[in-house]
Curated annotation (Swiss-Prot):
The lineage of its organism: Eukaryota, Metazoa, Chordata, Craniata, Vertebrata. It is an enzyme of class 7 (translocase). This is NADH-ubiquinone oxidoreductase chain 1. The gene is MT-ND1. It comes from Lampetra fluviatilis (European river lamprey). Belongs to the complex I subunit 1 family. It is found in: Mitochondrion inner membrane. Its EC number is 7.1.1.2. It catalyses: a ubiquinone + NADH + 5 H(+)(in) = a ubiquinol + NAD(+) + 4 H(+)(out). The chain crosses the membrane at residues 2-22, 71-91, 104-124, 148-168, 173-193, 224-244, 255-275, 295-315. Keywords: Electron transport, Membrane, Mitochondrion, Mitochondrion inner membrane, NAD, Respiratory chain, Translocase, Transmembrane, Transmembrane helix, Transport, Ubiquinone.
Length: 321
């Protein structure tokens, strides 16, 4: 019990530290892509800027609108960060803190619960801009989770199991990125939409909604939403690295698995930042059109194809119930 608590605490601290420096990397990347410096004053080359930002936000007085619902207004960001951090318990590095066989289903279920934090914050703010942003976030998240779920089903047929360890063992000789690149492309775009990142950041369209569902937040509660968002970005890219870029070769679980995953997740995270600097925001109807009229039929077709291939080849790879 004590070992599990210690492992959980270390994991949470490492994730929060990684999130802090991801914000600095993002600001520096955007700065250089826009021909400017970015943060470069606090510490050596601005390395301490995220620490200064965090201290500043948490020292500010938490304020909320007079008409807001205080309990839910404070509970929503806490719930968002708790759900975002709890997802990391299932990442094998090389062993996950929580060892269950239905890892992917639990990850999908916990990520689905994040819509309650968004909706609760928008409703509790008692602001029409926050509520519209929250409703957009809920519709977008639920829509693209359909795509994520179907892609996971296709990959589960190939691995024969619901755990991330099964993905690692299956990719000993070749990556799923090479054999299932259409699924990988749709998965990556869906993770952009799932984490509300550019070009799918309709929930915080500045010209329409000021800042989306967290428009009324300031200080510590706003920082919690910020940490939850970037923790989800790190988690989704780490999950992508494990699912599509699994370690190659025998005995792969013993060869510095954390370094292996980090080396593969880092380019994906940089790609997230590159996309933010390069692409404009979609219209809301284009966002939904992409999911329901493009991704969904293609996912269903690929799922049917892979299921029929697995059955026709003697049931190889089909999960045993």
């Amino acid at each position: 019990m004590l070992v599990m608590l210690t492992s959980t605490l270390i994991l949470v601290l490492m994730v929060l530290l990684a999130v802090a420096f991801l914000t600095m990397v993002e600001r520096k990347t955007l700065g250089y892509m826009q021909l400017r410096k970015g943060p470069n004053v606090v510490g050596f080359m601005g390395l301490l800027q995220p620490i200064a930002d965090g201290v500043k936000l948490f020292l500010k007085e938490p304020v909320w609108p007079t008409a807001a619902s205080p309990a839910l207004f404070i509970a929503a960001p806490i719930m968002a960060l708790t759900l975002a951090l709890s997802l990391w318990m299932f990442i094998p590095m090389p062993q996950s803190i929580s060892t269950i066989n239905l890892t992917l289903l639990v990850i999908l279920a916990i990520s689905s619960l994040s819509v309650y934090a968004s909706l609760g914050s928008g409703w509790a703010s008692n602001s029409k801009y926050a509520l519209i942003g929250a409703l957009r976030a809920v519709a977008q998240t639920i829509s693209y989770e359909v795509s994520l779920g179907l892609i996971l089903l296709c990959l589960i047929i190939l691995t024969g199991g619901f755990s991330l360890q099964a993905f690692i063992y299956t990719q000993e000789h070749t990556w799923f990125l090479l054999s299932s690149w259409p699924l990988a492309a749709m998965w990556f775009v869906s993770t952009l939409a799932e984490t509300n990142r550019t070009p799918f950041d309709l929930t915080e369209g500045e010209s329409e909604l000021v800042s989306g569902f967290n428009v009324e937040y300031a200080g510590g509660p706003f920082a919690l939403f910020f940490l939850a968002e970037y923790s989800n970005i790190l988690f989704m890219n780490t999950l992508t690295a494990i699912m599509f870029l699994g370690p190659l070769g025998p005995n792969n679980l013993n060869i510095l698995p954390i370094i292996n995953v980090m080396m593969k997740a880092t380019p994906l995270i940089i790609l997230f930042l590159w996309i933010r600097a390069s692409y404009p925001r979609f219209r809301y109807d284009q966002l939904m059109h992409l999911m329901w009229k493009n991704f969904l039929p293609l996912n269903l077709a690929l799922f049917t194809l892979q299921l029929s291939l697995a059955v026709s080849l003697g049931g190889a790879g089909v999960p045993q119930m």
